[in-house]
């Protein structure tokens, strides 16, 4: 007697072990877990073949060998089907309904109606389009960071190496490596520029010819080409320790400023970044001025007067670190107009100091002013919030509010500031279009809305309306959100904090509500037959500081006005919830339906009577107007007849026969 196990026949030698598959016994797994695992026909064939071989060798190897083989088959099968068992996370249905299907990227090349005759050429162009960078994308931003590093390196170290010969000669191998690495990055950036898309009529251009023409006809292209001219060949004519021949590399500065601009847009701390950026500019200006001061001192002669750098033959001033720090110190004192430096002696020294003073007055005054403005902007939020607190304090003192209430209000303000809840979301987002505001609101409040039972599977348009109408509210410890018997005008969704359902004494707790819970959603629908009506059935009190989202009844009714089908669905879902909880009076529902029918019939009768009255009035007006019209027509006919008779008599008197008869 043989028995099938997962499609495999067992040998007679193993019939005594037919109650469960050996692999399942060895692993301690249940039979239903193995049977529920998806597997293909190829897996069954493989396992069947291996087990068949095991059955042949079973008399020689025994029961343990067969178990090991079947166990190995189970492991292999589980590994092979691992990827098939893993399901991709499903996209959220709320966002799916709101965003709709994804649009495929359309380029200007695809939209101009020109197709390629050769399929291979078309495929090649498609491959090239894959390498077009979106200037708003992350890859482009990462490349800006890469290219900004060699630009900053050249701007800081080229001038220092050109002025401080010890710096150049002491590490010239390191400088050669860094120089040519930066040159490679510059050349790569030239090709990246040729593959960087731009927007035309709102679409990203990926046509290589358009990209090339758009870049080549700009001034930046000429500067980029000039920055990679191999001026290093001049090394063969002059000394290798002449880094000034590479000053053309400084022309690639635009990339560094572009990186700074995009970082300022992307960062969550723009004020801190702006201040850091200005500090960097100050340091670079001071650094350049220090290098130029050292170069002027070298050209005039070290130690020839009190203004130039001291004689380098003095051991105290003859090493590189002291040279640079001394020049940096002199540059800082001069540019910040602090003074306390030796006065100039020669004319060229006077001119240089005058130029430095102008830079210090104009540029540094501007920079320091910007820093002060940024710091003021950073404190603007705090100042505005403090002004609100002061106004409330003044009001409470004027109205002689108790000290306990005053302390409670101050603690509430402190909680708002500490937890960064002072931001007015509507004021911040008012400059965005409605579509973006709705999408941001959905991303922020999505997890909260999914907790509300009546809003499951509602229309995307209604969901957008409701999301935009959610209003955050913060309650202090001990505050009542609602009291028993109050008319329900809002529903609440708990974002953070804990609420307690308490007795009338305010102390005894019946239940505890935490983040994600919601209440009051049924009362704002005015469902007929509800035993609760539209009144609160419990006292709900905040245990600590609680953040809630509030949706008022008026806002809900305003939103569902344009969605009558959604309103019916919400009411039906509310009735289902009340029926499950035993809070729906079906007799009252039937009675209310009869009352509604009677009311509708009464309204119909009233409307019919009004219609009859209006029709009779219109008919009377029509009859009167018709009589007046007939009278006017009769008058006109009479006048026409009289006029015709007068014309006939006048024509007869003027005829020739009558004239001849009248002659004697």
Curated annotation (Swiss-Prot):
Region listing for Disordered, in residue ranges: 1-49, 641-664
Region (Ion conduction pathway) residue spans: 270-378
Cited Gene3D superfamilies: 1.10.287.70, 1.20.5.300, Helix hairpin bin (1.10.287.630), Jelly Rolls (2.60.120.10)
Residues exposed to the Extracellular side: 167-176, 242-246, 297-319
TM ranges: 145-166, 177-197, 223-241, 247-265, 273-296, 320-354, 355-379
Predominant location: membrane
Biased composition (Polar residues): 1-11
Keywords of the record: Calcium, Calcium channel, Calcium transport, Calmodulin-binding, cAMP, cAMP-binding, Cell membrane, Cell projection, cGMP, cGMP-binding, Coiled coil, Ion channel, Ion transport, Ligand-gated ion channel, Membrane, Nucleotide-binding, Olfaction, Sensory transduction, Transmembrane, Transmembrane helix, Transport
Free-text comment about domains: The C-terminal coiled-coil domain mediates trimerization of CNGA subunits.
Role summary: Pore-forming subunit of the olfactory cyclic nucleotide-gated channel. Operates in the cilia of olfactory sensory neurons where chemical stimulation of the odorant is converted to an electrical signal. Mediates odorant-induced cAMP-dependent Ca(2+) influx triggering neuron depolarization. The rise of intracellular Ca(2+) levels potentiates the olfactory response by activating Ca(2+)-dependent Cl(-) channels, but it also serves as a negative feedback signal to desensitize the channel for rapid adaptation to odorants.
Entry protein name: Cyclic nucleotide-gated channel alpha-2
Provenance organism: Homo sapiens (Human)
């Amino acid at each position: 007697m043989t028995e099938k196990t997962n499609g495999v026949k067992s040998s007679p030698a193993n019939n005594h072990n037919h109650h469960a598959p050996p692999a399942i016994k060895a692993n301690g797994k249940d039979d239903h877990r193995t049977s529920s695992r998806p597997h293909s026909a190829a897996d069954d064939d493989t396992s069947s073949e291996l087990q068949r071989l095991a059955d042949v060798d079973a008399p020689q190897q025994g029961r343990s060998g067969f178990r090991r083989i079947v166990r190995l088959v189970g492991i292999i099968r589980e590994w092979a089907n691992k990827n098939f068992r893993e399901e991709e996370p499903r996209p959220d249905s709320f966002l799916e309904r709101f965003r709709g299907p994804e649009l495929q990227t359309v380029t200007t090349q695809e939209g101009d109606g020109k197709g390629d005759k050769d399929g291979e050429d078309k495929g090649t162009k498609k491959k090239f389009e894959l390498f077009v960078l979106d200037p708003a994308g992350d890859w482009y931003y990462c490349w800006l960071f890469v290219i900004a590093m060699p630009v900053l390196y050249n701007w800081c170290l080229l001038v220092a190496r050109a002025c401080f010969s010890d710096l150049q000669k002491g590490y010239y191998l390191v400088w050669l490596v860094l120089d040519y690495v930066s040159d490679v990055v510059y050349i790569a950036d030239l090709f990246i520029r040729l593959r960087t898309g731009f927007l035309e009529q709102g679409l990203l251009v990926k046509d290589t010819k358009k990209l090339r023409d758009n870049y080549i006809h700009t001034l930046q292209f000429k500067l980029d080409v000039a920055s990679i001219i191999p001026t290093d060949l001049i090394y063969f004519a002059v000394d290798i320790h002449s880094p000034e021949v590479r000053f053309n590399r400084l022309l690639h500065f635009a990339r560094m400023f572009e990186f700074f601009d995009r970082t300022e847009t992307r960062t969550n701390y723009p004020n801190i970044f702006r201040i850091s950026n200005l500090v960097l500019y100050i340091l670079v200006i001071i650094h350049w001025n220090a290098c130029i001061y050292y170069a002027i001192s070298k050209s005039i002669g070290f130690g020839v007067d009190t203004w130039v750098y001291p004689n380098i033959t003095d051991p105290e001033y003859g090493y590189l670190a002291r040279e640079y720090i001394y020049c940096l110190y002199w540059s800082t004192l001069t540019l910040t107009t602090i003074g306390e430096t030796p006065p100039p002696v020669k004319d060229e020294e006077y001119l240089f100091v005058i130029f430095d003073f102008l830079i210090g007055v104009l540029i540094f005054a501007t920079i320091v002013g910007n820093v002060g403005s940024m710091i003021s902007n950073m404190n603007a939020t705090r100042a505005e919030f403090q002004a609100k607190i002061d106004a409330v304090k003044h009001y409470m003192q004027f109205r002689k509010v108790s000290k306990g209430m005053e302390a409670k209000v101050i603690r509430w303000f402190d909680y708002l500031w500490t937890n960064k809840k002072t931001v007015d979301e509507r004021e911040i987002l008012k400059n965005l279009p409605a579509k973006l505001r709705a999408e941001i609101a959905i991303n922020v409040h999505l997890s909260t809305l999914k907790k509300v039972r009546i809003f499951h599977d509602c229309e995307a348009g209604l969901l957008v309306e409701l999301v935009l109408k959610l209003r955050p509210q913060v309650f202090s410890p001990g505050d009542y959100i609602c009291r028993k018997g109050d008319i329900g005008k809002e529903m609440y969704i708990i974002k953070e904090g804990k609420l307690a359902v308490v007795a009338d004494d305010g102390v005894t707790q019946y239940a505890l509500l935490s983040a994600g819970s919601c209440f009051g959603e049924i009362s704002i629908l005015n469902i007929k037959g509800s035993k609760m009506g539209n009144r609160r059935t419990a006292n709900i009190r905040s245990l600590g500081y609680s953040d809630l989202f509030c949706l008022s009844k008026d806002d809900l009714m305003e939103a569902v006005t344009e969605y009558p089908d959604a309103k019916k669905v919400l009411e039906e879902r509310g009735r289902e919830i009340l029926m499950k909880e035993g809070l729906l009076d079906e007799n009252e529902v039937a009675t209310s339906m009869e009352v509604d029918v009677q009311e509708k019939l009464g309204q119909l009768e009233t409307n019919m009577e009004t219609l009859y009255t209006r029709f009779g009035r219109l008919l009377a007006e029509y009859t009167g107007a018709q009589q007046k019209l007939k009278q006017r027509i009769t008058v006109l006919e009479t006048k026409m007849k009289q006029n015709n008779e007068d014309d006939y008599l006048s024509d007869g008197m003027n005829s020739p026969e009558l004239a001849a008869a009248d002659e004697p």
